[in-house]
């Protein structure tokens, strides 16, 4: 068995894996234990009461977090004409059609999000084997295939997170940085949970949000007592 580092021993001593923590206590604990030499992200894992084997119970979507994610997002937009000008005005770093596709084919992908207008999907469709495995393929379900590309760019820049359950029915995403104020992390988490509950499949029965855990990039998961979150969640 691998020897635990001093840091991991400290984390194990501080975090009670059998306990659900008050949200404020959970955030304070994450901040205390975030001792990496870089600014760690705060991630969340939400266990959903779904059967991920059934396509009609899978959960996928996007929501804008009120305080963003703390990341500078570079956006590429496939579109043309007036939409191209609107995308540039909204802050997109790369805008084009075949010329942008050529960059992608060359491996020049200096962007984090790809957005496309419906008329551009004939070009984007050729890039599925490149963009798909990287999680960059535009999709109408998460608002990245849209006639209103300017709004989509603004949402991406404002801290929109995309979510999709894995094969175990768990949503993994980021809700900010460890340098955020505690209230900012709490409000971002609450906004995500509100969005998830709105996306609950009609065929999912019983408790929908079964467990919520938050962690930092290099830290352990801390389970959150959902009763300590806002009443709107």
Swiss-Prot record:
It comes from the Bacteria. One of its GO terms (biological process) is translation. One of its GO terms (cellular component) is cytosolic large ribosomal subunit. One of its GO terms (molecular function) is structural constituent of ribosome. Transmembrane segments: none annotated. Keywords: Repressor, Ribonucleoprotein, Ribosomal protein, RNA-binding, rRNA-binding, Translation regulation, tRNA-binding. InterPro entries: Ribosom_uL1_bac-type, Ribosomal_uL1, Ribosomal_uL1-like, Ribosomal_uL1/biogenesis, Ribosomal_uL1_3-a/b-sand, Ribosomal_uL1_CS. The keyword Ribosomal protein applies. Binds directly to 23S rRNA. The L1 stalk is quite mobile in the ribosome, and is involved in E site tRNA release. Protein L1 is also a translational repressor protein, it controls the translation of the L11 operon by binding to its mRNA. Part of the 50S ribosomal subunit. Belongs to the universal ribosomal protein uL1 family. This is Large ribosomal subunit protein uL1. It comes from Vibrio cholerae serotype O1 (strain ATCC 39315 / El Tor Inaba N16961). The gene is rplA.
């Amino acid at each position: 068995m691998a020897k635990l580092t001093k840091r991991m021993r400290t984390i194990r001593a501080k975090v009670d894996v059998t306990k659900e923590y008050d949200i404020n206590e959970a955030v304070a604990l994450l901040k205390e234990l975030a001792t990496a030499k870089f600014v760690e992200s705060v991630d969340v894992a939400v266990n959903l009461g779904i059967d991920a084997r059934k396509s009609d119970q899978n959960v996928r979507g996007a929501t804008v977090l009120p305080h963003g994610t703390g990341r500078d997002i570079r956006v590429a937009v496939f579109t043309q004409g007036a939409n191209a000008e609107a995308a540039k005005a909204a802050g997109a770093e790369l805008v084009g059609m075949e010329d942008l596709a050529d960059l992608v084919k060359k491996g020049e992908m200096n962007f984090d999000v790809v957005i496309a207008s419906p008329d551009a999907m004939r070009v984007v469709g050729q890039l599925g084997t490149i963009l798909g495995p990287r999680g960059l393929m535009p999709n109408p379900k998460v608002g990245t295939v849209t006639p209103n590309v300017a709004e989509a760019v603004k949402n991406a820049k404002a801290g929109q997170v995309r979510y999709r359950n894995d094969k175990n029915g768990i949503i993994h995403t980021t809700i900010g940085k460890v340098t955020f104020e505690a209230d900012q992390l709490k409000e971002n988490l609450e906004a995500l949970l509100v969005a998830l509950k709105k996306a609950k499949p009609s065929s999912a029965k019983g408790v929908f949000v079964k467990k919520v855990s938050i962690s930092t990039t290099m830290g352990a998961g801390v389970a959150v007592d959902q009763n300590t979150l806002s009443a709107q969640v």
